[in-house]
Structures are given as C-alpha cells and as structure tokens.
Swiss-Prot record:
One GO biological process term: proton transmembrane transport
TM annotation in the entry: 19-40
Lineage: Viruses, Riboviria, Orthornavirae, Negarnaviricota, Polyploviricotina
Predominant place of localization: virion
Protein name: Glycoprotein NB
One Pfam family matching this protein: NB
Keywords in alphabetical order: Glycoprotein, Hydrogen ion transport, Ion channel, Ion transport, Membrane, Signal-anchor, Transmembrane, Transmembrane helix, Transport, Viral ion channel, Virion
UniProt-recorded Gene Ontology molecular function terms: channel activity
Localization annotation: Virion membrane
GO CC field: host cell membrane; membrane; virion membrane
Topology Intravirion: residue spans: 41-99
Self-association state and partner proteins as the record states: Dimer.
Length: 99
C-alpha cells in the first residue's frame, strides 16, 4: 500500500535549471522595460515646457505633449512602458485615465 509515495530524486536538474532561467529572464525583462520607461518619462518631462505646445494643445492636454492622455490627440505620441495592472497592482506609471 505504499504505491502512492512519490520519489523526487529522479527529477531532471537540467529542466529545473532551464525553467528557473526562463522565469528569471522574463522578470528581468519586465523590470528593465519599467525602469527605462520611467527614466524616459522623467527626461521628456524635464525637457518640455508649456511654450512647446500651442493654445489648442494646452487647452486639450493642460501639460506637456508626450503626457497628453486624450485619446483623440494623435499629434503627441505617448512614451514609456505600460505596465498591465495584473503585474504590478497599485503602481500606475502610464498616466492613463480610464474612460
């Protein structure tokens, strides 16, 4: 009646290491993208002033062009990395407002 016991000594260590490496690479990639996106937003925000945009955009966005969060404005591309809410809950770096 001892057939239900599992023997974990036969687990292939190569496959275990391979899985750990894949997970580490994925997590590192997400962290690197987040850091680079955040740094890019800081540099862009420091380099733009209210004089860089016209009256129409100032009324529409009330700030620098790259940070315009209106969906109908296609003249100002957004920069940075959008982090899905299920990966980092409570951390909003994308500055997007839900409609």
């Amino acid at each position: 009646m001892n057939n239900a016991t599992f023997n974990y000594t036969n687990v292939n260590p190569i496959s275990h290491i391979r899985g750990s490496v894949i997970i580490t690479i994925c997590v590192s990639f997400i962290v690197i993208l987040t850091v680079f996106g955040y740094i890019a937003k800081i540099f862009i925000k420091n380099n733009c002033t209210n004089n860089d945009i016209g009256l129409r955009e100032r009324i529409k966005c009330s700030g620098c062009e790259p940070f315009c969060n209106k969906r109908d404005d296609i003249s100002s591309p957004r920069t940075g990395v959008d982090i899905p809410s299920f990966i980092l809950p409570g951390l909003n770096l994308s500055e997007s407002t839900p409609n």
